[in-house]
Amino acid sequence: MRHGKAGRKLNRTASHRKAMFANMAASLITHEQIVTTLPKAKEIRPIVEKLVTLGKRGDLHARRQAISQIRDAAVVSKLFDTIATRYATRNGGYLRIMKAGFRQGDNAAMAVIEFVDRDTYAKGAADKARVAAEEQAVAA
């Protein structure tokens, strides 16, 4: 019996779950919106919310804790520079989960998880180019 056991196994080993959540958190921070299954979205939400809170702390120890979880320095720098400043006045509730129907292949419940007040133009490499262009325009 699994009385009082928190979290979902998602039919994966512990190491696979840990790696999957790290990859999903990095993708969510990079693109600010991802489409996944509803149980995965519900599991990744508290992980990313705690990472945003680490970003809001902003000290070296918090940055190292975030890097140990995400394992991508570029994503952590976006988390600490862009996302943490955006939510500086908000106490929690940085993400929203919206149901997005069912997947055709296996009828799995799908969901969109995204940042509240997200940058609608955040599209990975294109987002970096756009931000760099805006910074050059401000500097000039």
UniProtKB/Swiss-Prot annotation:
Highest taxon above the source species: Bacteria
GO cellular component: cytosolic large ribosomal subunit
InterPro entries reported for this sequence: Ribosomal_bL17, Ribosomal_bL17_CS, Ribosomal_bL17_sf
GO biological process per UniProt: translation
SUPFAM superfamilies in alphabetical order: Prokaryotic ribosomal protein L17
Gene Ontology molecular-function annotations: structural constituent of ribosome
UniProt KW 4Fe-4S keyword: no
Alphabetically ordered keywords of this record: Ribonucleoprotein, Ribosomal protein
HAMAP family: Ribosomal_bL17
Assembly, per entry: Part of the 50S ribosomal subunit. Contacts protein L32.
Family: Belongs to the bacterial ribosomal protein bL17 family.
Protein name (Swiss-Prot/TrEMBL): Large ribosomal subunit protein bL17
Organism encoding this protein: Rhizobium etli (strain ATCC 51251 / DSM 11541 / JCM 21823 / NBRC 15573 / CFN 42)
Gene name linked to the record: rplQ
